[in-house]
Amino acid sequence: MRLILFFLLFTVMTKVLAQDLQDSSDTEFSIQKFTWSTASVGALSAGSLYGLGKLWYGQQSQISFHLFNDAKNWMQMDKLGHTFSCYHVTRGLDALFSWTGLKEKKSLLLAAGIGLTYFTGIEILDGFSESWGFSLSDMGFNALGVGLYVFQEHYLQAQIFKPKFSFHQTRFAIQRPEVLGSNFIESVLKDYNGQTYWLSFSPGQMGLDKWPDWMMLSFGHSIRGRLKGDAMSYGGITSHREFLFSLDVDLSRLNVKSKFLKGLLKSLNTLKIPFPALIYANGKMNARPIYF
């Protein structure tokens, strides 16, 4: 399921590239662009939901619609993934509809509505699966991701606080490859021990004059030793949280002349740049010279 979400994210980010390849002065509404964009998004959304229903959920036992409380599973790392995905999908959709010339407020509302509707559709599919269920906590974190983008765009007129993602391989996937991934790609999507979700911001974008607006401070959250979603200890290993502080780079603020490269950097701005990091865990502070 996570692979489908990231595929959607990648697809809408390519529309950001299309936006940057256009003349910035071209802001007049185009019915052709709008029709093409909405049709593409609709087809992608419907197609991916249909594919999920047939290829993923079709392999699972189906029962009547029900709720499922997984708020404590994986120490909320999967919830942060929902927030991250919803934020960036909304960001990509807003960029796409802005490219069509749609007015700012309408573009923002349409992007938020489509993003939240899409992720709600996935939760509804979960609701009919015997192995899962409709998760109210998932919906809450979905709304948080959409809301974070909408709030900043509407009230701050800028995306100052940017959710980002990083990953490093861990030894825990080897112990439960069927759950945490049997190869690198699977582990990126499944091994929460190797994932870190960050919130990056630049003091220079908040009024600190001498601070470069491309240099960011970043706060992260990760976990370690979690082998089973609802179990603090498993296989003799006890899990714990990690809170991190590091630096980051706002790739969208780098001074590059190529419109293609500028758009590409904007797309890659979902990823946290490796830097030294301070890590607080189990009441102790540690440092790493480089953290992925």
Language model regions located:
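N-terminal targeting leaders of membrane proteins
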Residues: 5-79, 83-90, 94-102, 159, ...
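Transmembrane beta-strands of outer-membrane beta-barrel proteins
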Residues: 114, 118, 161-163, 213-219, ...
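Interfacial helix-loop-helix junctions of multi-pass membrane proteins
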Residues: 122-143
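Residues on the lipid-exposed face of transmembrane beta-strands in outer-membrane beta-barrel proteins
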Residues: 147-151, 197-203, 245-251, 288
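Transmembrane beta-strands of outer-membrane beta-barrel pores
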Residues: 167-171, 221-227, 251-253
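Outer-membrane beta-barrel translocator domains and adjoining extracellular loop/strand segments
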Residues: 176-178, 229-234
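A conserved mid-domain beta-alpha-beta active-site/ligand-binding segment of alpha/beta enzyme cores
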Residues: 177-224
